[in-house]
C-alpha cells in the first residue's frame, strides 16, 4: 500500500498512542490471553495479580511473592521475559469498581471469581491502562524506551522498536495521540529515532491549545491546529472578522515559520462534532442526552449551515498550513460529538455541488504556490463581516476576501496599498474580473462565501476531473445494504452446564448462538478458567482432564461479547458388570438378531 501511494505522491502517517495500551494487549493481558500462546513474555496484570494473591494468602513479603511468581510462570508457561511487569502500576490495596460501586471480578484466567486489582486507566477507563511515567517520564520506565523508541536513536538502520519498525515498512511519520500527556523528554528522544531513518519523516502532535513549546525543533514538526478550527468556525458562525484574524496572527507570530506552514489545519475530527453539524448548532459534547431527538441528518440541517461550510472550506484552502479534511466532510456528512462523528462513509450519497467545491478549491491551491507557501498579511477593515488576507510569493499576489453574512456585500479595497499593482483583477474561483483603476477595486463578495483575486494576466486554467468525483455523489456508487457489515450484538449458549467423565470430550460449538443470525463475522474463541480440569481448543472441543469444575468462556471476535459454560468433570466410571437383554437365543438358519 505504501509503495502504491508513493507512486501517486501520497504519504502515510501512522497514528500512535504511546502513553496507554489496551487491557487485552500483550503488554497488560488482563484476560490471560497470551499465557498459553507460546510467547515467552508475560503481561503486567497476570504477574502482579499472582504476586498480590500470594502476599495475601501466604502472608509472605513482596520480594518472596515475586520470586515465587517467576518460578511458577517459568515452570508452567515457559515465561522468561518479565519486562512488561515494570511498565504499569498495579495496586495491591485497591480493586476495580463498577458503576454501582461493586467490585469487578475476574471472569477468566487463573483468578476467575476474584476481585480485579486496581490500576491507573487513561481518563479513568480501565480498558486502557496507563504506561508508568518514572520520575515523570515514560522514557525512564523499564525497557519501554528500548522497545518503543529504539535501542540506538541515531542509527540509520531500523531496529524492531515500535517507532522504527513501521517507518521501515513504508510509513512516512507519526501522528501522536494525546501528545501533551507524554513527557517532553520522551518526545525529544522519539524525534531523534524518527529523524535518524529519514529527516523527512513527519511528527504531528495532538495539541488543542498553544503548541509553541512543542515546535522549537526538538519534538514535533506540526500539530493538529485546533486553534485554527476555533477561529474559522467562530467567524463562519457570525463572529467578528477582527477576532478571527487576531487569533490567526497570534499563531503566525508565535510559531516558527517552518511549523506555521506545516500546521494541520482541521475544522473537525474524530474527537469533535462534525463541521456541518457544528455550524448548525450542535456543540462538542460527548455527554449530551438529547442526541436521540437531535440526531443530525443532512436533510434536517439548515440551509444556512450548509452554505457556511463553503466559507469554512475556502478559508482552509487559502490560509497557510495544510488543509485537513475529515473524511466525508466534502460529501456533507453530519454527526454529533464522538462517537456519532465516526459514522461510515456515505459513498454515492454526498452533495454533488459540495464535492465539486472542495475539489475546485484543492485544484486552485495546487495551481498557485502563493496559496501554499506564500506570505500571509491580514487585511483589517471596518466591516466585521468581511475577513481578508493577502497571500503572495515571487509568482503571484492574491487577495482573499470572505463574507460571513447572509447577504452579498460590495467591498472596496485599496489594493495598491497591499502591493497589488495590476490594472485589472480576476476572481480565480469564478473567472469574473474587476477594474483596479486608481489602485482600488470594488468587488461583490457572495454571502457565506468569498473571492480570490489576482492579476487577471496571471489567472491559470484550473480543471477538475469530475469523473473521479462521482463516487462521492453518484448513487451508482452507493453501498448496497447487503454489502454493509452486520455487527454482532451478543452471544449465548443453548447449554450453560455440561458434565463429563474424566478422559471424555465434548464439542460445545454447536451450542453457541451468535446474534443476530445474519451477523457478518460470527467467529468466536474459547478460553478455559482451569485447563487442569477441562481444556478447550480453538474449535470448541472440551476435554475433561481431572475431577472438578471449570468455566469455558466463549468470546465473539466482533464486539468481544461473552457467554459461559460450566463444565463439571467427574471420575471415570468403571463398568461393574455387563447385562444382555437375552441370556438364551434360538435362531433359524440364515436369520440374525442384535443383542442389547
Listing of model-derived features with the role each one plays in the protein:
Residues 2-9:
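Short, small-residue-biased leader/transition segments that mark boundaries at the very start
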Residues 19-121, 217-225, 340, 344:
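Aromatic- and acidic-residue-enriched segments that line the glycan-binding/catalytic groove
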Residues 20, 51-76, 158-164, 171-266, ...:
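Active-site-proximal helices and loops of the catalytic beta/alpha 8
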Residues 140-167, 309-313:
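Short, acidic/polar
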Residues 260-301:
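Active-site clefts of carbohydrate-active enzymes
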Residues 401-405:
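Asparagine-centered strand-capping/turn motif at beta-strand->loop junctions
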Residues 436-482:
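C-terminal beta-strand-rich structural cap/linker in extracellular carbohydrate-active enzymes
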Residues 478-596:
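Extracytoplasmic soluble-region selector
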Amino acid at each position: 500500500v505504501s509503495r502504491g501511494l508513493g507512486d501517486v505522491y501520497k504519504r502515510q502517517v501512522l497514528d500512535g498512542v504511546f502513553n496507554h495500551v489496551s487491557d487485552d494487549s500483550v503488554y497488560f493481558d488482563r484476560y490471560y490471553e497470551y499465557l498459553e500462546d507460546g510467547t515467552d513474555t508475560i503481561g503486567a496484570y497476570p504477574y502482579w495479580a499472582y504476586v498480590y494473591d500470594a502476599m495475601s494468602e501466604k502472608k509472605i513479603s513482596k520480594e518472596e511473592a515475586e520470586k515465587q511468581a517467576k518460578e511458577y510462570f517459568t515452570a508452567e508457561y515457559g515465561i522468561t521475559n518479565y519486562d512488561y511487569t515494570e511498565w504499569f502500576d498495579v495496586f495491591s490495596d485497591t480493586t476495580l469498581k463498577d458503576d454501582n460501586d461493586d467490585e469487578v471480578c475476574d471472569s477468566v484466567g487463573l483468578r476467575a471469581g476474584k476481585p480485579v486489582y486496581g490500576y491507573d486507566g487513561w481518563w479513568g477507563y480501565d480498558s486502557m491502562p496507563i504506561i508508568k511515567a518514572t520520575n515523570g517520564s515514560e522514557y525512564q520506565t523499564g525497557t519501554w524506551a528500548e522497545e518503543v523508541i529504539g535501542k540506538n536513536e541515531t542509527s540509520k538502520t531500523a531496529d524492531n522498536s515500535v517507532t522504527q519498525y513501521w517507518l521501515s515498512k513504508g510509513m512516512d511519520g507519526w501522528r501522536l495521540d494525546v501528545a501533551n500527556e507524554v513527557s517532553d523528554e520522551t518526545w525529544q528522544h522519539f524525534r531523534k529515532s524518527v529523524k535518524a531513518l529519514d529527516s523527512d519523516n513527519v511528527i504531528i502532535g495532538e495539541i488543542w491549545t498553544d503548541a509553541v513549546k512543542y515546535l522549537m525543533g526538538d519534538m514535533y514538526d506540526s500539530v493538529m491546529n485546533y486553534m485554527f478550527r476555533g477561529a474559522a468556525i467562530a467567524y463562519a458562525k457570525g463572529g467578528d472578522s477582527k477576532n478571527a484574524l487576531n487569533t490567526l496572527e497570534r499563531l503566525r507570530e508565535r510559531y516558527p515559520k517552518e511549523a506555521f506552514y506545516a500546521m494541520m489545519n482541521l475544522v473537525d475530527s474524530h474527537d469533535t462534532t462534525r463541521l456541518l453539524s457544528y455550524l448548525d448548532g450542535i456543540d462538542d459534547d460527548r455527554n449530551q442526552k438529547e442526541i436521540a431527538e437531535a440526531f443530525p441528518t443532512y436533510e434536517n440541517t439548515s440551509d444556512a449551515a450548509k452554505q457556511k461550510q463553503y466559507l469554512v472550506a475556502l478559508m482552509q484552502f487559502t490560509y497557510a498550513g495544510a488543509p485537513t479534511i475529515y473524511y466525508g466532510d466534502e460529501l456533507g456528512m453530519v454527526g454529533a460529538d464522538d462517537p456519532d462523528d465516526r459514522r461510515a462513509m456515505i459513498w454515492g450519497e454526498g452533495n454533488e455541488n459540495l464535492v465539486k467545491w472542495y475539489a475546485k478549491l484543492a485544484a486552485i491551491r495546487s495551481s498557485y504556490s502563493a496559496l501554499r507557501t506564500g506570505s500571509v498579511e491580514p487585511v483589517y477593515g471596518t466591516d466585521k463581516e468581511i475577513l481578508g488576507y493577502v497571500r503572495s510569493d515571487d509568482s503571484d499576489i492574491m487577495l482573499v476576501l470572505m463574507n460571513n453574512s447572509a447577504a452579498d456585500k460590495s467591498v472596496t479595497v485599496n489594493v495598491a496599498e497591499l502591493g497589488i499593482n495590476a490594472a485589472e483583477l480576476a476572481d480565480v474561483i469564478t473567472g469574473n474580473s474587476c477594474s483596479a483603476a486608481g489602485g482600488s477595486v470594488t468587488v461583490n463578495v457572495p454571502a457565506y462565501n468569498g473571492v480570490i483575486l489576482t492579476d487577471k494576466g496571471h489567472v491559470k486554467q484550473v480543471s477538475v476531473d469530475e469523473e473521479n468525483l462521482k463516487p462521492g455523489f453518484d448513487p451508482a456508487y452507493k453501498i448496497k445494504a447487503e454489502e454493509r457489515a452486520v455487527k454482532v450484538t451478543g452471544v449465548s449458549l443453548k447449554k450453560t452446564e455440561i458434565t463429563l467423565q474424566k478422559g471424555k470430550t465434548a464439542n460445545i460449538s454447536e451450542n453457541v448462538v451468535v446474534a443476530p443470525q445474519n451477523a457478518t463475522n460470527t467467529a468466536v474463541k474459547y478460553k478455559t478458567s482451569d485447563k487442569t480440569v477441562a481444556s478447550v481448543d480453538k474449535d470448541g472441543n472440551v476435554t475433561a482432564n481431572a475431577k472438578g469444575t471449570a468455566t469455558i468462556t466463549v468470546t465473539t471476535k466482533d464486539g468481544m461479547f461473552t457467554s459461559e459454560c460450566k463444565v463439571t468433570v467427574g471420575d471415570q466410571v468403571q463398568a461393574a458388570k455387563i447385562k444382555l437383554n437375552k441370556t438364551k437365543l434360538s435362531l433359524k438358519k440364515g436369520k440374525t438378531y442384535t443383542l442389547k
